[in-house]
């Protein structure tokens, strides 16, 4: 029997503040009675970055003139995925091409590759954070394992179509330069974001801030991270895996 694994962080005003700011406001109209049923209409409004929480990056994020995320073919955002187990990676440990050579032998051309470090779950503060897929410790940002340029070049050479992460993308390797991964920054300059530029320059989409990848037990699954049809360089997604 197929099993569905939800890999998305919840979006709410309680979202962990050091990195993201989410503002969801709700307006309720007066209660009316319709055919004997009391109804109180509600409308919510949301303001946040398209790169907030679980989202997908299109090449336009770093390459001028590329298509908006709403014009990316839908089939690029779902399909067969290779799950690469990196759960033994510790604090500030790089994910390299050598790691992929050893652990990614099951990666095929056209795959989505999911890098399973378990870092989100390792930094969940309590039951609520674990349930909602949210990191609750500053160490999530300051001490996480991170992908490297060599890893990104390996992905491009294998002609994968997307790469998904459950750890911060590449911020932590620059902590010793005085950069931060929190909302206030300062963030690394684009020329230092080698993983972003390597992937997106070659049309490899990035799916960031996944969670619950440790619940995936098989090394190949079907995976979905379909964006909204936005005229923007990225979009929130509801990411999930189907394990047969």
Residue ranges and their predicted role:
Residues 1-244:
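Active-/binding-site microenvironments in catalytic and ligand-binding cores
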